[in-house]
């Protein structure tokens, strides 16, 4: 842990304004965003699974509110055009998730751990990581996003022995707790800490 904290301290000063600015955007979305805005963010999180944040951002810009109203085949075609690896399947997930419209604002404002579990159980294409990602991107600070970049970093620094191939609730919470302790030692919430880790790995602060 100590070596990772040293690496993070070296980038803290340059990363902090970017992290704070990005998190303000997240909080604004959670507080002021409409159900449609929140649904578009949920759809972004569906798309980034087994793809990339950059691809998801590109798709979000191209499709916009089309996530809410485009017919299935049109949405699949749009995802094909932006280069998604699984356009048909992801379009099916997004269309099926429209049943959650009207519930998202309450989820964002509710208990983050209960909201995450609800999304894992009820949203298509959303697992523990994706549900954490959505809630963090709407201003929730308490959850860790255990994506492959973060897990590789954790393994490299001896925080975990191996990268899990899949997530059960128990396993996700166990690894999340390890990362939470590192975040606390760094003096940040898990949600913000993730952005510092991204800056360390990528040299930028995505979402």
Swiss-Prot record:
Per the UniProt entry, the disulfide pairs are none
Q: Could you name the active-site residues?
A: 129, 147
Q: Which GO terms describe its biological process?
A: base-excision repair
**Keyword Hydrolase among record annotations:** yes
| Catalyzed reaction equations | 2'-deoxyribonucleotide-(2'-deoxyribose 5'-phosphate)-2'-deoxyribonucleotide-DNA = a 3'-end 2'-deoxyribonucleotide-(2,3-dehydro-2,3-deoxyribose 5'-phosphate)-DNA + a 5'-end 5'-phospho-2'-deoxyribonucleoside-DNA + H(+)
Annotated site, Important for guanine/8-oxoguanine distinction, chain positions: 207
Keywords tagged on the record: DNA damage, DNA repair, Glycosidase, Hydrolase, Lyase, Multifunctional enzyme
Q: What is its EC number?
A: 3.2.2.-, 4.2.99.18
Family (UniProt):
Belongs to the type-2 OGG1 family.
Q: Tell me, what does this protein do in biology?
A: Catalyzes the excision of an oxidatively damaged form of guanine (7,8-dihydro-8-oxoguanine = 8-oxoG) from DNA. Also cleaves the DNA backbone at apurinic/apyrimidinic sites (AP sites).
Protein name as annotated: 8-oxoguanine DNA glycosylase/AP lyase
């Amino acid at each position: 842990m100590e070596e990772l904290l040293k690496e993070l301290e070296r980038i803290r000063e340059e990363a902090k304004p970017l992290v704070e600015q990005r998190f303000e955007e997240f909080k604004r979305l959670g507080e002021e965003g409409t159900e449609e805005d929140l649904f578009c963010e949920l759809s972004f999180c569906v798309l980034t699974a087994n793809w990339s944040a950059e691809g998801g951002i590109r798709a979000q810009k191209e499709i916009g509110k089309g996530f809410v109203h485009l017919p299935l085949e049109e949405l699949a075609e749009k995802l094909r055009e932006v280069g998604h690896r699984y356009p048909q399947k992801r379009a099916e997930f997004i269309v099926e998730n429209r049943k959650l419209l009207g519930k998202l604002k309450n989820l964002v404002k509710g208990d983050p751990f209960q909201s995450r579990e609800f999304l894992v159980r009820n949203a298509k294409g959303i697992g523990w990581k994706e549900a954490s990602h959505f809630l963090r991107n709407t201003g929730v600070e308490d959850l860790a996003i255990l994506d492959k970049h973060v897990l590789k970093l954790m393994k490299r620094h001896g925080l975990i022995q191996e990268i899990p191939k899949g997530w059960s609730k128990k396993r996700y919470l166990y690894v999340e707790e390890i990362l939470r302790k590192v975040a606390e030692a760094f003096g940040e919430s898990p949600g913000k800490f993730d952005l510092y880790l991204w800056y360390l790995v990528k040299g930028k602060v995505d979402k």
